[in-house]
Design a protein with these regions (language model features):
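A short, surface-exposed alpha-helical micro-motif characterized by mixed small hydrophobic
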Residues: 113-115
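Conserved ABC ATPase signature
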Residues: 48-52
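Helical segment within the ABC ATPase nucleotide-binding domain
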Residues: 87-99
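Catalytic Walker B motif of ABC-type/P-loop ATPase nucleotide-binding domains
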Residues: 73-76, 82
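Conserved ABC ATPase "signature" region
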Residues: 15, 19, 26-44
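Hydrophobic anchor residue at the start of the ABC signature
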Residues: 62
Length: 140
């Protein structure tokens, strides 16, 4: 969950969190536009967050995560509450991000994992029970 300032616009919210994470102004300007497009909020960039639906706020949270261009991104149940179109868009974003970043995706939605993961790790009661390459059986 991300704390939002309801009177900030989507763009201002992302800029603010990027600033807090130490992103320099030049990089922030280009990254904000890109992440807004990536999460399909570009058309809503000047709308106040208080007018956003739950799914839009969730996508805004994803944009906030991505704006600082981290090497590792951890998503916990990121597609819950997204409609099918936005779920597909998010999976495409994960595929794009995973080319240059390590993505850890925690989910109960098997189709999310099957479509975007290279490896599956199952943890039960804090213990690793499975580590497997998707499409193969070569445990590493």
């Amino acid at each position: 969950n991300v704390g939002y300032y309801p009177n900030f616009t989507a763009k201002k919210t992302i800029e603010y969190f990027g600033y807090l994470r130490g992103v320099n102004k030049k990089e922030l300007d280009s990254n904000v536009e890109q992440v807004l497009r990536d999460v399909n909020l570009y058309e809503n960039r000047n709308d106040k967050v208080k007018s956003f639906s739950g799914g839009m706020k969730q996508r805004l949270g994803i944009a906030i995560t991505c704006v600082a261009n981290p090497e590792i991104i951890i998503f916990d149940e990121p597609t819950v509450g997204l409609d099918p179109e936005e779920r597909a868009r998010f999976k495409n974003l994960i595929r794009k991000l995973s080319k240059t970043k390590t993505i850890v995706l925690s989910t109960h939605i098997l189709s999310d994992v099957e479509e975007v993961a290279d490896y599956i790790i199952l943890i039960k009661e804090g213990c690793l029970t499975k580590f497997e390459k998707i499409g193969g059986k070569d445990n590493e």
